[in-house]
A protein has these predicted regions:
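Second-shell loop/turn segments in exported
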Residues: 44-54, 129-130, 186-189, 202, ...
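Amphipathic alpha-helical substructures
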Residues: 189-229
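Metalloprotease/metallohydrolase-associated module, dominated by Zn2+-dependent proteases
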Residues: 64, 169-197
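Hydrophobic helix-coil surface modules that form long, contiguous segments used
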Residues: 1-113, 142
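Zinc-dependent metallopeptidase catalytic helix centered on the HExxH motif
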Residues: 57, 97-158, 216
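Active-site-adjacent bridging/hinge elements
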Residues: 34-38, 89-91, 114-119, 166-180
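Active-site-adjacent structural elements in folded domains
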Residues: 82-84, 103-107, 179-188, 201, ...
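Secondary-structure capping and boundary motifs in well-ordered enzyme cores
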Residues: 91, 104-113, 132-135, 139, ...
Length: 229
């Protein structure tokens, strides 16, 4: 017997679909400040059950975090999927993200936040990831760092700061506006993610949090479902 499933989603520029008969499926709803309610799903396998036991909470926290600071999540569903160990990292798509297995719930929490954040920075604000990597990875990492700060955690940031300072001294640093293919190894991760995030932090301090938030929310309002560059 053939089973046909049909999926439709407006206002997206990318698509992915995942299936595994072994998936444990968790479901809850998330209520945003406006009163809008969205469906939240997480999918994982038995070996990751302990690490993923709070995955719904992490996903809901991330959706509310980005919605409150940048702009309301426009879709009706968000899903987080555990991929195979060979996958290596996380990959974002509109309304859904896939992650490789994590060693701890702490790292899973922040990986979920980062990948869900890409719904805003790459998904809704459809920048050119390869030409302007900082506009999705840098901006997204900035808001992920705020997510960490809310939980009094600075996961990995001290190491990145030390690396950046070393690269600057050794003159191996590159501008945040460098295109992806022109980054030296390991500058893509260090510059496009971390350095761009620190630049956003300095900009917020210069403008003041209220003005900065208003500017970013206006950017979101004007450019959602478009391709800023």
């Amino acid at each position: 017997e053939i089973k046909i499933l049909t999926y439709k989603q407006n206002n997206i520029h990318d698509f992915a679909w995942f299936a595994d008969k072994r998936f444990i499926v968790n479901y809850d709803t998330c209520k945003l400040a406006s009163g809008k309610v969205i469906d939240v799903f997480t999918y994982y396998t038995t070996p990751q059950k302990e690490v993923w036991k709070s995955s719904l909470l992490y996903a809901k926290d991330a959706i509310q975090h980005y919605s409150s600071l940048v702009g309301e999540y426009p879709y009706n569903v968000v899903s987080v999927v555990q991929g195979p160990a060979s996958f290596g990292g996380g990959m974002e798509y509109p309304t859904i993200t896939v992650l490789s297995p994590e060693k701890s719930s702490r790292s899973l929490n922040f990986t979920i936040a980062h990948e869900i954040g890409h719904n805003w920075f790459y998904g809704i604000l459809g920048t050119n990831e390869r030409k302007y990597a900082w506009m999705d990875e840098g901006m997204n990492s900035f808001y992920e760092s705020k997510y960490q700060q809310r939980q009094n955690d600075h996961f990995g940031q001290r190491t990145e700061q030390s690396l950046l300072e070393t690269f600057i001294v050794e003159k191996k640093d590159q501008p945040i506006g460098t295109s992806s293919e022109d980054f030296n190894e390991p500058n893509y991760g260090l510059i496009a993610y971390y350095k761009a995030s620190k630049w956003m932090t300095l900009l917020e301090k210069q403008l003041g949090t209220a003005v900065f938030n208003k500017a970013m929310q206006e950017y979101y309002r004007q450019w959602q479902f478009k391709h800023p560059q």
